[in-house]
Amino acid sequence: YMSLPVCFGAKLLGIKIYLLEPNIVLGRANRLFLGFCKKIFTYTESLKNFPEKLKHKIQIITPLVKKNFYEKREIKTENKAFCLLVVGGSQGAKIFDNVVKNVIVNLSKKNKIKIIQQTHKSNTDQLRSIYDEAKIENTIFDFEENLADLINQSDLCITRAGASTLAELSIMNKPFLTIPLVSAKDNHQFENANFYQNLGCCWIMNQKDFNDVNLEKFLNHIIMNKSEYNIKKDN
């Protein structure tokens, strides 16, 4: 809602308003000013909750991400470990911590695994210790300005379904498993995830199904079935 006072001021001063909607569901603030704006920039014209009579205002653009996300290329090495990136953010780190660590330790007994995982600052040492004890190569962080470098190292990402993160992953052709936040307003995270799933870029797992058994089964399947993984990657 940071755009609300800016748009109110622009309306009062007679300044032209241009909106950006990165989600697949039209946000409430954008909905409020849609009638007053000149254009609304989106990643698709198939926005949920968008008035048909105002669709002429839509201008489709490529996702707005930092330049370095477009510049990164895959790092290719022989016999490299399968690298999993886990990006939780403030609303995903705890549930990801509880499930991912056990699965990675189990998978590492039969597979060469590397883990790059975001967690809360208070949990970095504990999580690092668990992976170190299991002799798993790991990078544990609470915040990283240059996320593009970490995405570049990874083979697969586990993430929520925020618009920015999914756009960054898709730009870099990284397949991802997304667990949409169930409490997101207007269910916009599920709609974001569904958009990329329809493009063939990702898999969706509902939060109620996100547990040790299902995640380990999924990752085992991906590691053993490179053809399915490569189809997602090429999309």
Where are the predicted features?
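Active-site-proximal region of nucleotide-activated glycan assembly enzymes
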Residues: 11-72, 198
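An aromatic- and histidine-rich active-site surface loop
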Residues: 1-13
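Short alpha-helical segment that forms part of, or immediately flanks, the ligand-binding pocket
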Residues: 8, 148, 166-174, 194
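Alpha-helix C-terminal capping/helix-to-coil transition sites in glycosyltransferase folds
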Residues: 35-36, 149-153, 171
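Short hydrophobic beta-strand element within catalytic cores of glycosyltransferases
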Residues: 159, 175-186
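Conserved donor-nucleotide binding/catalytic region of nucleotide-linked donor-dependent transferases
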Residues: 203, 208-235
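Donor-nucleotide binding loops and adjacent catalytic segments primarily
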Residues: 73, 77-156, 190-194, 205-215
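Acidic donor-binding loop of glycosyltransferase active sites
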Residues: 152-167, 174-175
